[in-house]
């Protein structure tokens, strides 16, 4: 397929969307979300005053076994199964609630387009399938090294 990719095409790529969610679940872009309580509240027996600062540990939520079956396993299919309920706020790859990232839908479309354009013209393989990914885990996480082999696909 050599034609231009359309918005409609990208919206049909459900498995690409599942891959994006699963990669983001296992390796979130941010490790911590910050929130401030608007009013006094009680959660699980603990009382919090208004203006209490909360630091939300994103990897802990996204890897918690009460939210995910086999949380350490890369499994995009977990997002394809309409029967499997993902608990609210168990996936925070773009934040959540009133402060969810405004660019979420655009970013997902761009990632899908990147996947299509890359894999349309190239074969991409990890150099070491058993090796881990070298990344820096700070407030904003990023990959430091990921050796890959890229080959141009030849047209038939």
Go through the PLM ranges and name each one:
Residues 53, 138-156:
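C-terminal helix/juxtamembrane-tail motif
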Residues 80, 87, 104-141:
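Cytochrome P450 heme-binding "Cys pocket" and the immediately downstream C-terminal segment
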